């Protein structure tokens, strides 16, 4: 099953995350199929590729709870309807 989840990078105590599409069996920081966004929790900065995210959601990719909350803030799910 495909998951849309966070992949951590950045320095110690200064996390940044890439929002990636990956197989659910792959490690958190393992190889991703596609990068569809970026999230910085320290500055609350978010960059999303809306078209690719909507396409992946329509094909059955499941977002994790944290990613779902980021998508709700950015109103990604409004584009599905």
UniProtKB/Swiss-Prot annotation:
InterPro entries assigned to the protein according to its UniProt record, in alphabetical order: Ribosomal_bS16 (IPR000307), Ribosomal_bS16_CS (IPR020592), Ribosomal_bS16_dom_sf (IPR023803)
Molecular-function annotations in GO: structural constituent of ribosome
Intracellular or extracellular location(s): Plastid, Chloroplast
Gene Ontology terms: biological process: mitochondrial translation
Name of one Pfam family that matches: Ribosomal_S16
One cellular component term from this protein's GO annotations in UniProt: chloroplast
Keywords of the record: Chloroplast, Plastid, Ribonucleoprotein, Ribosomal protein
Location (main, coarse): plastid
UniProt similarity note: Belongs to the bacterial ribosomal protein bS16 family.
PANTHER family referenced in this protein's UniProt entry, alphabetically: 30S RIBOSOMAL PROTEIN S16, SMALL RIBOSOMAL SUBUNIT PROTEIN BS16M
NCBIfam families with a match to the protein in the record: S16 (TIGR00002)
Protein name: Small ribosomal subunit protein bS16c
Taxonomic source organism: Emiliania huxleyi (Coccolithophore)
